[in-house]
Regions:
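Core dinuclear metal-dependent hydrolase active-site scaffold
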Residues: 1-3, 99-100, 104-115
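Cap/insert and terminal regions of metallo-dependent hydrolase folds
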Residues: 2-95
Length: 115
């Protein structure tokens, strides 16, 4: 993720919406577990760290795999921006729609670098 131009990351659930969900306790626990899904806050914190460690800053972040039961695009974006600590002008963040084709993102391959 470091020095990436574009990042696509899961932002599956809002913690309050999950907590208030009608889904059973076992399902809610699975979603939050280490083998479950990434919450909006954790996605934001992670990308905030990536941004700060990157010499070449990412220009675009797309939040993906939003839960239809425990998230909305507005929740995902608000949670992400608050947790990332980044200013809205720092990068373009969008939430991919669940049921439709979203904004087209064009990617180009740059020069190969050895790790």
């Amino acid at each position: 993720f470091i020095d990436s131009d574009a990042i696509f990351i899961e932002s599956n659930y809002n913690e309050q919406l999950l907590r208030n969900s009608t889904r059973g306790a076992m399902d809610r626990a699975r979603v939050k577990s280490g083998v479950g899904h990434l919450c909006n806050i954790d996605a934001g914190r992670f990308i905030g760290r990536v941004y700060n460690l990157s010499a070449r800053k990412p220009a675009n972040v797309t939040l993906m795999h939003l839960s239809s039961d425990h998230n909305t695009p507005d929740h995902a974006l608000a949670d992400f921006m608050q947790a990332s600590g980044l200013a809205a002008e720092a990068l373009c963040v969008r939430a991919a729609p669940r049921e439709a084709v979203g904004t087209e993102v064009r990617l180009a391959l740059g020069p190969h670098r050895r790790l």
